[in-house]
Amino acid sequence: MVCMRFRYICHRKPERTFSFRGHYFPVCSRCTGIYLGAFTYFLYAFLIPVKYTAATVLLALLLVIPTFIDGFTQLMGYRESNNVLRFSTGLPAGIGLAVLTKVLKHLILHI
């Protein structure tokens, strides 16, 4: 039942999902990294004020690029990724996406 709740936020392919003691995580390894990175950044931004500049936005965009490259090269069949690499590229992407979300929120509220 828990697994069905997550079907809308992740494809949940078993071969791309971490497992612990025979139980699969509710999301794939890349999404695990993305969600963990985003949660970590939101917690950080809640505790420590962050000033968002053009450099911050550029850095956030750069953090997403490795995930794009990993996913795209796998999709095109150039190579096969693994769960550690998926998680390792998902983590900074989650941080980058969280920063971009906070910047967007700031822009919307201060227009």
Curated annotation (Swiss-Prot):
Coiled coil: none annotated. Keywords: Cell membrane, Membrane, Transmembrane, Transmembrane helix. The lineage of its organism: Archaea, Methanobacteriati, Methanobacteriota, Methanomada group, Methanobacteria. The chain crosses the membrane at residues 45-65, 91-111. One of its GO terms (cellular component) is plasma membrane. It comes from the Archaea. It is a multi-pass membrane protein. This is Uncharacterized protein MTH_518. It is found in: Cell membrane.
